[in-house]
Amino acid sequence: MNATPEKADDLIVVGKIFSVHGVRGEVKVYSFTDPIENLLDYPRWTLRHEGKVKQVELVSGRGSQKGLVVKLKGLDDRDEARLLSGYEICIPRSLLPNLAADEYYWYQLVGLKVINQDEQLFGKVDHMLETGANDVMVVKPCAGSLDDRERLLPYTEQCVLAIDLEAGVMRVEWDADF
């Protein structure tokens, strides 16, 4: 394992180590990719936790009931593996596949101002939730917001009218009373 970090603002969190598996240094990982096995397509990871940064290489991985079980190069001891519990798994943005013009990664939506059809500012996208039926945007108030309410808006074609990443704005069809 190497301690040389990637440029911090270029990294995207794609998973998290949550436990150990067995006695040979394997770790259990929750993947944020879809499908979850896509995380295994990235052979080098940057791990981050409480200001600590480590570079690691993936040796192997497989699916399990609650995520993935992975083997990292140089990690052969259960006690050493346990120290990585809680670390975020990051990769450089440049490694993410290109998307179609009307598709976005969640990280691109976070921070966008959300304005409805009546030009009312609801706030900014704070984070996204995966609910099964459709993704949900958690919109928290910001300076200039209509009110101080947190809103949960569906990330659907019916709700999201337009996204302008350069302007930092998302236009939605959503009543302020909802």
Curated annotation (Swiss-Prot):
A GO CC annotation given for this chain: ribosome
What keywords were assigned to this record? Answer: Chaperone, Cytoplasm, Ribosome biogenesis, rRNA processing
Q: Name one GO biological process term.
A: rRNA processing
Do you know which Gene3D superfamilies this protein is assigned to?
Answer: PRC-barrel domain, RimM
Question: Pfam families recorded for this chain?
Answer: PRC_RimM (PF24986), RimM (PF01782)
Q: Which cysteines share a disulfide bond?
A: none
Cite the GO molecular-function annotations of the record. ribosome binding
Name the InterPro entries for this protein: PRC_barrel-like_sf (IPR011033), PRC_RimM (IPR056792), RimM (IPR011961), RimM_N (IPR002676), RimM_N_sf (IPR036976), Transl_B-barrel_sf (IPR009000)
Cellular compartment(s): Cytoplasm
Keyword presence, Cytoplasm = yes
Domain spans labelled PRC barrel: 101-178
Spell out the family assignment given in the record's similarity comment. Belongs to the RimM family.
What functional role does this protein have?
An accessory protein needed during the final step in the assembly of 30S ribosomal subunit, possibly for assembly of the head region. Essential for efficient processing of 16S rRNA. May be needed both before and after RbfA during the maturation of 16S rRNA. It has affinity for free ribosomal 30S subunits but not for 70S ribosomes.
Which PANTHER family has this protein been placed in?
RIBOSOME MATURATION FACTOR RIMM
Assembly and partners are described as: Binds ribosomal protein uS19.
Q: What is known of its domains?
A: The PRC barrel domain binds ribosomal protein uS19.
**What is the protein named?**
Ribosome maturation factor RimM
Provenance organism: Pseudomonas putida (strain ATCC 700007 / DSM 6899 / JCM 31910 / BCRC 17059 / LMG 24140 / F1)
